[in-house]
Every structure is written in C-alpha cells, then in structure tokens.
Swiss-Prot record:
The active site is at H5, H41 (nucleophile). Binds 1 Mg(2+) ion per subunit. Keywords: Cytolysis, Dermonecrotic toxin, Disulfide bond, Hemolysis, Lipid degradation, Lipid metabolism, Lyase, Magnesium, Metal-binding, Secreted, Toxin. It holds the Pfam family GDPD_2. It is found in: Secreted. This is Dermonecrotic toxin LsaSicTox-alphaIB1bii. The keyword Disulfide bond applies. Mg(2+) binds at E25, D27, D85. InterPro entries: PLC-like_Pdiesterase_TIM-brl. Belongs to the arthropod phospholipase D family. Class II subfamily. Its cofactor is Mg(2+). GO terms for biological process: killing of cells of another organism; lipid catabolic process. Expressed by the venom gland.
C-alpha cells in the first residue's frame, strides 16, 4: 500500500492517486464537543509541505465517497484504503467514546451513504493515544445501533503513538479488537528514525500469536529509506511522494516480492515474510 500522506483537501485526492497512491491518510480534528470538525493538520507539519489545507470533515467525506464509488465521474479504481489520523489530543480521555460515536455517524451518513452504494474503500481509524481506546468501542456500538454492523468489515485500527508493542496489545484487548490491526511506526520526514520498532512490529505480525496484521512506516520520501523499509518487510509506506515509492517498487529487486494492492486484496489479512 502506497499511502499518500496528509491528504486534507478534496483536490489532493486526485493529485496523490495520480502520483501512484492506492491509499491516503487524512487528518481529522475535533471540536470541544468531540465532533469531527475539519480535515486539517496545521503547523508544524512535514518539511516541504503546506500544513494548512483543509475541508470541513463531512464535506471531505462527500468528496472521498465520490472518489471511491464506481460509476462516479470522480471515481479512482485504485484508491482502496483510507487512514484517518484522528487528532484526539485536543480531547479529554473521557470524550473518546463520544468521538467514536460521532465519527461513526458522520461516516455512515456522508461516506457509506447509510449503507446504500457508498464509498468502497476500507477505513483505518488511527488513534494517537492508547488511553483513547474507547473511541473504537463507541464507533462499533454506534454502527450496531444504527443497524449497519456489517460496515465494521470495512474498518481497521492503528495506534500511532509509537508505544511499546506490548502496551498496544493491551489497549486492543480492552477495546475487544481481535483483528483488522495495522501497526504504524514512524516520525516526520524532517527527522530520522531507525527501523528497530518496525522490525519488532513485523516480528509480531509474523509470529503465530501476534496481534498485528499489517505494518506501515511513515513518512518516507527518499529512495534509500524506501528500500530499507521494504527490506524490513513492511506492508505499507506512507509518503509525500507516491511516485518515489512506485519507482522503487518497480526495481527488479522488489518486483518479485511486492506488488501494489488492489481492491481484491484484503487489507486485514496477514502476509508473513
């Protein structure tokens, strides 16, 4: 999965997919009542990027739905996965459940079209704080209450705080999550980060009793670091330059082992090294 980083304006969906992304990451900020409000990152952000592009969250979902609904004039067949980077740092811990509830209602209405031919991409809820695991509970219980529990088949999870792998496992246990787990590891492109924790995450994925299904590394903009991440066995790379990742994947060293995921590839299924 080539994951376009910080796609916060509808116009950027076309831009990143045309550069080779089959997945995008979108920032979601919340108001003080835990309503998802904007797709917005803000300053500071990655080096070389404009930090202030934004839409209202529900407006963005409408654009995303069009981009992932077959037959729509804006449809992109290859856009199959969306990571929502949920900026829950502005919330109190006890608002996490409400945030999950409100997020589910927004997606149900504006992305899934109440279960009637909505957008088809799979969604990863990426949460920065392990203490906010109840966001998952709120999300799940709301879809059940709204009589669309089947949409949970399209939803996965990520805790993005670079926490100890054992602590992440405990948070999932509390949330009752037993699959659909992506594990991120990374840092802004302005700084360097080694691959030690990525290797631990890959080892967990590849073990018989691990909780991780997929591992992605962020934010990778250079060919050398792309090769290092692929050599470590990641499933996804988040980048500001999807064309760079696509170029490296076309090198002879990688074409035999990796291919770009399509809609038919299950993003919750584990492939071991």
């Amino acid at each position: 999965w080539i994951m376009g980083h910080m796609v916060d304006a509808i116009a950027q969906i076309d831009e990143f997919v045309s550069l080779g992304a089959n997945s995008i990451e979108t920032d979601v900020s919340f108001d003080k009542n835990a309503n998802p409000e904007y797709t917005y990152h803000g300053i500071p952000c990655d080096c070389g990027r404009t930090c202030t592009k934004w839409e209202y969250f529900n407006t963005f979902l409408g654009g995303l739905r069009k981009a992932t609904t077959p037959g729509d004039s804006k449809y992109h067949e290859k856009l199959v996965l969306v990571v929502f980077d949920l900026k829950t740092g502005s919330l109190y811990d006890n608002q996490a459940y409400d945030a999950g509830t409100k997020l589910a209602k927004s997606l149900l209405q504006n992305y899934w079209n109440k279960g009637n031919n909505g957008g088809r991409a799979c969604i990863v809820l990426s949460i920065p704080n392990l203490d906010h695991y109840k966001l998952i509970t709120g999300f799940k219980e709301t879809l059940t209450k709204e009589e669309h529990p089947e949409l949970m088949d399209k939803v996965g999870y990520d805790f993005s705080g670079n926490d100890d792998i054992g602590d992440v496992a405990k948070a999932y246990k509390k949330a009752g999550v037993t699959g659909h787990v992506w594990q991120s590891d990374g840092i802004t492109n302005c700084l360097l980060r080694g691959l030690d924790r990525v290797r631990k995450a890959v080892a967990n994925r590849d073990s018989s009793n691990g909780y991780i299904n997929k591992v992605y590394y962020w934010t990778v903009d250079k060919r050398a670091s792309t090769r290092d991440a692929l050599d470590a066995g990641v499933d996804g790379i988040m980048t500001n330059y999807p064309d760079v990742i696509a170029d490296v994947l076309s090198e002879s060293a990688y074409t035999a082992k990796f291919r770009i995921a399509t809609y038919d590839d299950n993003p919750w299924e584990t492939f071991k090294n």
